[in-house]
Amino acid sequence: MVKNKVCLICLFLALYFLFSCKTGNSERNLPAIHLKGTILQPDSILLGHKVVAIVDSHLVVPTWKNEYLYDVYKMKGDSLLLNNRLISRGQGPYELTVSEEMYDVLSGRFVIYDCNMGKGFLLEGDSVGKMMDYTLWKSLGKFHNEVYISKMVIETDSTVVTAFMQDGFKAFLGRYNLNTGKHSILYGLWPDDGFEGSDYVKQTVYANGSLLKCPDKNLFLVSSQMGQYVEIFRIEQNQIVPVSKLFDLYPQYEVANDGLNVRYSRDNMRGLDICVTSEFIYVMPDRGTMEEYVRDIQNSDSYNYTDEIFVYDWNGVLRKRFKLDYDILTLLVDKDNHFLYGKSIDKETSDEYIVRFELDGRF
């Protein structure tokens, strides 16, 4: 009898541990490695909120300026020197009005696209010279009609994998052929979050999160915009095959009163910021719930910023937990896992700056 009770207790603990691992709770208990950051001082006002690419010791930073979409800074020691500007705002053949981007950290290529215009470019980013030469840009053409593409990542020289919204399909991932302009749907991943309403509303929740690819393997990653859901998958022919969930805290939401949009519960965790290299997945959970955010944001300019990063391999195994000495908003890691870059803020002056953290010897 005692032996049976012991077995039941062991089984309960094992199940609890497994559940905690899936939901991301157990990661909090992993000993933290503390990282010391260095502020990179810009030679001009920094009007961007993240680093999206690292090219030839240059950082590409989206800007809020009216004329251009990106500023390009050269790193010199602990300084940032404004070196160039990339992509004018407008309706011209080499212009966009707003932009999203996907950077392939291994090859240096990245896609810059405007979801509203249905237009984008593939840039060769292995050198600043190539990146700035618009004659080398490959146009993506008009990449949506009935389908609205919100995210895309490079799969091959001729295809990108997309996150999309198009009513009537229980899927939110697809493949767009750059040569033919054809968009096809990839089935096999439809998160079991309990929502039974419109397919389009559910697509909106997951198509506006993160979509990333392992630079040298047939492995991809998606996350939700709210909640804390992260899943690794691969593609076999035209089918998605789930591989591993890093977090499965699904978002809580419903159809808004207009019948089209999403209304999120204020109990939702506020999502995650993620970047990847060939070896690792860096996950930075946002701080608090939506309710806490709405309540506290008025009293703290730095509420959006956090100091904790979890590092997984592409098998879904947690490898490290980093604790930063600066709170950051977004993150990007170079292809060799040598440095991590994040946007931070001075809590007293509200000045914004980029911080660099050294990762050498941490793995």
Give the ranges of each region predicted by the language model.
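Beta-strand-rich domains and repeat architectures in extracellular enzymes and scaffolds
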Residues: 39-70, 280-293
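Asp-box/WD-like beta-propeller blade repeats and closely related beta-sheet repeat scaffolds
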Residues: 116-118, 125-157, 163
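Beta-propeller blade signature
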Residues: 74-75, 171-178, 297-317, 354-361
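Blade-loop segments of beta-propeller domains
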Residues: 81-111, 115-116, 137-144, 199-200, ...
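A short helix->beta-strand "capping" segment at the edge of beta-propeller domains
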Residues: 25-47, 317
